[in-house]
UniProtKB/Swiss-Prot annotation:
UniProt-annotated stretches for the region Disordered: 161-190
Domain S5 DRBM residues, every copy: 19-82
Function summary: With S4 and S12 plays an important role in translational accuracy.
Pfam families xrefs: Ribosomal_S5, Ribosomal_S5_C
Record protein name field: Small ribosomal subunit protein uS5
GO biological process terms held by the UniProt record: translation
Source domain of life: Bacteria
Keyword Nuclease: no
Keywords of the record: Ribonucleoprotein, Ribosomal protein, RNA-binding, rRNA-binding
Keyword Phosphoprotein annotated: no
Gene Ontology molecular function: rRNA binding; structural constituent of ribosome
Length: 190
């Protein structure tokens, strides 16, 4: 009696594999043993669907392709959703840090492009953000930069989510005021 293949853990359907992956860094590492050194490779990979979901993962193995495969699997399991403004930039400026890695992410006007250093650029390209200005202030270690970028992205929130948390309207959060009848004439005279 043949069993039907399961659809992953929890019975969830597998998503269409429209996920792109970017290799951030690969590093040869050594384990010192009695007979000398054992070499392995450590890989850091960022994955995303370019629609607001992104994740990162690290993998280590004796061969480069196996390390990249492990890192990619871990990255797919650690994906987060980031709210984007108009599908191209962040809603607000945000700061993040991990260890000595500190990053500042700023939303940008249309046509600005991705102004960011190497590891951060891979995160934004995988995320689908087209306009952002980012600056790394601390450690230049790729692992710390990526983790600091994710710490910042996790702090991002949309005006709609802020409004629902506070029990207000989105217009109250954004500071847009509707003119009250009778005040239009007063503003013209002032």
């Amino acid at each position: 009696m043949a069993r039907e293949p399961r659809e992953g853990r929890g019975g969830r359907e597998r998503e269409a594999d429209d996920i792109i992956d970017k290799l951030v860094t690969i590093n040869r590492v050594a384990k010192v043993v009695k007979g000398g050194r054992r070499f392995a490779f450590a890989a850091l990979v960022v994955v995303g669907d370019q629609k607001g979901r992104v994740g990162y993962g690290a993998g280590k193995a004796r061969e480069v392709p196996e390390a990249i495969r492990k890192a990619t699997e871990r990255a797919k399991r650690s994906m987060i959703r980031v709210p984007m403004k108009e599908g191209r930039t962040l809603h607000h400026d945000v700061y993040g840090h991990f260890g000595a890695g500190k990053v500042v992410l700023r939303s940008a006007t249309a046509g600005t492009g991705i102004i960011a250093g190497g590891p951060m650029r891979a995160v934004f390209e995988s995320l689908g953000i087209g306009d952002v200005v980012a600056k790394s202030l601390g450690s230049r270690n790729p692992h710390n930069m990526v983790k600091a970028t994710f710490a910042a992205l996790e702090r991002c929130s949309s005006p709609r989510s802020v409004a629902s948390r506070r029990g207000k309207k989105v217009s109250d959060i954004l500071g847009r005021r509707e003119p009250v009848a009778g005040q239009e004439g007063e503003e013209a005279h002032a």
